[in-house]
A protein has these predicted regions:
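Gly/Ser/Thr/Ala-enriched C-terminal appendages of enzymes
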Residues: 55, 78-101, 106-168
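Buried, small/hydrophobic-residue-enriched core segments of structured protein domains
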Residues: 2-86, 90-91, 116, 121, ...
Length: 168
């Protein structure tokens, strides 16, 4: 996007939060990762990933400022119906109309899964869907389910690698 002067689009990678946890400590990882994301991307790429250190932990850091600032959330693991209710509750508690926020559902979705979630959401928020594996591999063979995650990093160019963790 920078090279071609395009508006960047996308969401946080888990590794962003994982790095912040290793560097700054896991108790403050979500809050610092959100703050630094805002500093780096200046309001672009406004869909927040919620599950690096569990969704409940994420929501404890996703205060009113971030809930208003970010365009929405990305569901990437767990039960989409439970997540939807948590997101709706969180926005309402912050006095934000959930219909003004986007949730990107993106965990191993197929067309039937999208229809089921869409029916459940029923216009209570703006729902969009990331169908990767099953859209590009809808030919009747079982897709590979492969996730690659960071397992260590060198904070600020240090000499030693530090372990990182992801909890969903």
């Amino acid at each position: 996007a920078m090279k071609y002067n395009l508006t960047p689009m996308g969401t946080h990678p888990h590794e962003w939060f994982m790095y912040h946890g290793a560097h700054y400590g896991y108790r403050s990882a979500n809050a610092l990762a959100l703050a630094n994301w805002v500093d780096v991307y200046d309001g672009h790429l406004g869909i927040a990933l919620t599950d690096t250190y569990t969704t409940d932990n994420f929501f404890s850091s996703f205060d009113t400022q971030y809930a208003k600032l970010f365009d929405g959330l990305r569901w990437d693991s767990g039960d989409p119906y439970v997540f939807t209710e948590k997101a709706l509750k969180h926005y309402r508690e912050k006095r934000i109309d959930p219909r003004t926020k986007t949730v990107v559902y993106s965990d191993a979705l197929d067309l039937e899964g999208v229809e089921n979630i869409r029916s459940f959401v029923n216009g209570r928020l703006h729902d969009v869907y990331g169908i990767g594996t099953f859209l590009s591999n809808d030919v009747g063979v079982k897709p590979l389910n492969m996730v690659i995650k960071m397992f260590e990093c060198k904070p600020q160019g240090g000499k030693e690698f530090w372990p990182v963790v992801k909890l969903s």
